[in-house]
Amino acid sequence: MKKLFASLALAAFVAPVFAATQTVTLSVPGMTCASCPITVKHALSKVEGVSKTDVSFDKRQAVVTFDDAKTNVQKLTKATEDAGYPSSLKR
């Protein structure tokens, strides 16, 4: 029983180590008016794991910080596309 408890306790402490926060920049060229960034920001903020979004109309981009254990770039681009604003990873 002690070994089981020790194993579970160790797993609980090790699991968060594998999760990492990432920040990516998405190109969102379809934003054509000042209210577009509001829609894009709302769509991205609804994705589980997203902790911060900064959407710029002037640069036509979104900078997104997220937990890569909960989401990924594909889910972020799908969220913007579903909101009517296709995006891609900016390199």
From Swiss-Prot:
Annotated Gene3D superfamilies: 3.30.70.100
Keywords: Mercuric resistance, Mercury, Metal-binding, Periplasm, Plasmid, Signal
Listed CDD domains: HMA (cd00371)
Ranges of residues in domain HMA: 22-88
GO cellular component: periplasmic space
Pfam families: HMA
Binding site for Hg(2+): C33, C36
InterPro entries: Heavy-metal-associated_CS, HMA_dom, HMA_dom_sf, MerP, MerP/CopZ
Protein location: Periplasm
A GO molecular function held by the record: mercury ion binding
UniProt keyword annotation of Transferase present: no
Keyword Metal-binding in record: yes
Chief location bin: periplasm
Extent of the signal sequence: 1-19
Membership in a protein family: Belongs to the MerP family.
Subunit structure: Monomer.
NCBIfam families listed in its UniProt record: MerP (TIGR02052)
Function of the protein: Involved in mercury resistance. Acts as a mercury scavenger that specifically binds to a mercuric ion in the periplasm and probably passes it to the cytoplasmic mercuric reductase MerA via the mercuric transport protein MerT.
The name this protein goes by in its record: Mercuric transport protein periplasmic component
Top-level taxonomy: Bacteria, Pseudomonadati, Pseudomonadota, Gammaproteobacteria, Moraxellales
